[in-house]
Amino acid sequence: MFKLPSDRVFIIAELSANHNGSLEVALETVKAAKRAGADAIKLQTYTADTITLKCDQPDFKIEGGTLWDGRYLHDLYLEAFTPWEWHEQIFKAASDEGLVCFSSPFDPSAVDFLEGLGCPLYKIASFEITDIPLIEYAASKAKPMILSTGIAKKIDIERAVDACLRQGNKDLTLLKCTSSYPAPIEEANLRLMVQFKDDFPVSVGLSDHTPGHLVPVIATTL
């Protein structure tokens, strides 16, 4: 069974929607991640219909100074998702490069699909940290769990960690995250990584959205 290393930094490259709808770009990104020195590459596993509703009401329109202001959620996710039929090829390409490949599932059907691919660990996205049924289901697979905390209050983190522990899953990592794209360096607040280690029985890391490399380099010292 896969275990995250405890004696060194483990670098994860994010594929997410960076393929721009092209499988060729996705596969080239895997190779680029290897050349850049990453240990792993992460996907996101959802469809527009499993993550949101096709609705033009205000609550489904993106606002607030983001890169996607004015877009409706369903339209954006339909454009950004990684087709599930690509996953097997991406997992194989990563394996061929010596990279660990895993994903963020956004609903139980995604967990089931990823189990069929032998996904070695799961990462819960910041905006899913309050989805306790999803966390419990992923944790029940007895694989390492990485939880991002970008929008979480302490009580949300406590509940998510407890959800994993209830499933007997103690292989947990909490990531400090600022849910902005890009995230201002002055909002990095890396001291929370130390606080996480004090408050929870977990390993810690950083989900970095800042420009440049200053913040992740500093994070490796904590």
Please describe what each predicted stretch is:
Residues 1-222:
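Catalytic cores and adjacent flexible loops of soluble metabolic enzymes
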